[in-house]
Amino acid sequence: MRIVVFLLSFIRCFSFASQSVTFIHKNSLKTVEGQRYKSGLLYSAPNSKRTLHIVTLDWPPYISNDLCNKGWVYHFAVAVLNSQGYSVYLEFLPWARAVRNVELGKADILMPEYYIEDTAPSDYVKNKMRRELLGISNSFQGGNIVFLKRKNAPGIFTGNLISLKGSTIGVERGYQNTPEFDAMMDNEEFKVISAVNDLQLMQLLFAKRVDLIIGDPSVLAHSVTFSELNQNEKIKLLNAVEQDGKPLHYNSLYFAISKLTPNWLEVLDDINQALYIFYNSGETDRLINTVSEECAV
């Protein structure tokens, strides 16, 4: 019987949780079903103003096409926009390609994004800053950014970024971390080795190719736990690293809107209004808690 219950829960999770989004709006429970569309899912709103194309990445445990319910940020994005009358076409892409598509106007919204500084240059539009190409929403819940080191290795980060000078640090390609850290990186005050994903970052640290890596600890741990490594390799890798010093920063998350999207300022205002409503009504926390527990068996 327990096996049957487990299988039913497993099938239900993959068949339904990943296809529908449920949220509370104006004291009413709303459910919107996702329909296969192009290379993603389309969530249609009644009397839709228009369809907005969101591009995102696999970034578990926040959001991933491989999570049983795609993660709370996925549900949150659909709910926020649907509550404002927008249909949503949501597509998973490699991060660098997602950034490129939104900056070039091939998609409307990039999320979840960290705060983008005015001085951050675009990698895809020559002589342009990213903020010239993208509008940034108000913030929503994110996570800490920390340095990880090998266990038993001397601590490097003292709380002052100056302590990083001369070190070799692993970073994920295309990510912004903090303005101060990124400025030091651009000035080559420490050596950088880029990784294509969080698992590769962890492996760089384990292999002693870098002194530290920077990232969200929950994302880094998840990248190992749900990788294709065998169980012994996972345990060995996770047990070999630890946080170096206090968190560097708490990074909130944002929606980034292409300024090539028609009436992008109106879309930005609608998103900010929904963020305010969701936060003050408690719907943001409810969604996070509900979706995070949804696939627990």
Question: Which stretches of residues belong to each language-model region?
Answer:
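Acidic, polar ligand-binding/catalytic clefts
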Residues: 23-25, 91-163, 242-248
